[in-house]
């Protein structure tokens, strides 16, 4: 079991380009023409997997950047480890996002509208980091600017301008999107940063 998990920790991200392309082709062929709103919900999945391809594979380096940048670590591999990254990404990006698409298919797109807000918020964080950390590239920035943010904003505009969601559902979707993004930030800054300080490899501790 440990060998299997260790293999997954090392290689899970390598399937992202194939998964993104395969999923995009399927939803383009079988969903787009039948239900465009549902298509936009499903499209958040391959868009985000493409985003992760940039973060972790080509050019990659997101763990190193995030640890030594936002988390203030002196180490590229801690406090956010490969295992930690796996358990953050898999439940949210590979379970919750597709599940929202499935639920939207059977029970209505209200169930998946939150993904557009989440995608926009998460991608916007890369733009914020670009300005905070010396206007330098961070892994995931290109996909965020060219794919995730435009797609997220367009999806929100399309749903609102066509009256596809009620005010209540819109507010609920905003809240869920914020909570999803905030949960990752809380884990990073309320748990991982204190951990790095406690274990002595945070920059503030290192300088002392």
Predicted regions and their residues:
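Membrane-proximal helix-loop-helix units in multi-pass membrane proteins
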Residues: 92-146
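Hydrophobic alpha-helical transmembrane segments in multi-pass integral membrane proteins
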Residues: 148-169
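Juxtamembrane helix-capping/reentrant segments at transmembrane boundaries
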Residues: 65-88
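Short, hydrophobic transmembrane alpha-helix segments
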Residues: 25-38
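Core segments of transmembrane alpha-helices
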Residues: 17-23, 84-102, 122, 147-153
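Short, highly charged, low-complexity non-transmembrane loops/tails of multi-pass membrane proteins
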Residues: 195-208
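The first (N-terminal) embedded transmembrane alpha-helix
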Residues: 9-28
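Small-residue-rich segments of transmembrane alpha-helices in multi-pass membrane proteins
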Residues: 139-155, 206-208
């Amino acid at each position: 079991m440990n060998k299997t998990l260790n293999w997954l920790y090392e290689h899970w991200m390598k399937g992202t380009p194939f998964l993104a392309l395969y999923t995009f082709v399927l939803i383009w062929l079988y969903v787009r023409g039948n239900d465009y709103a549902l298509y936009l919900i499903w499209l958040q999945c391959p868009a985000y997997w493409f985003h992760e391809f940039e973060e972790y594979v080509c050019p990659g380096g997101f763990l190193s950047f995030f640890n030594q940048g936002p988390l203030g670590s002196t180490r590229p591999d801690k406090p956010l480890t490969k295992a930690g990254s796996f358990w953050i990404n898999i439940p949210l990006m590979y379970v919750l996002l597709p599940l929202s698409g499935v639920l939207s298919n059977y029970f209505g797109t209200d169930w998946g509208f939150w993904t557009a807000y989440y995608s926009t918020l998460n991608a916007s964080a890369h733009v914020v980091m670009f300005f905070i950390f010396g206007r330098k590239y961070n892994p995931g920035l290109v996909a965020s600017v060219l794919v995730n943010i435009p797609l997220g904003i367009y999806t929100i505009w399309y749903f609102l301008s066509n009256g596809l969601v009620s005010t209540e559902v819109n507010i609920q979707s905003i809240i869920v999107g914020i909570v999803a993004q905030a949960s990752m930030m809380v884990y990073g800054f309320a748990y991982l940063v204190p951990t790095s300080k406690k274990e002595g490899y945070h920059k503030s501790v290192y300088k002392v």
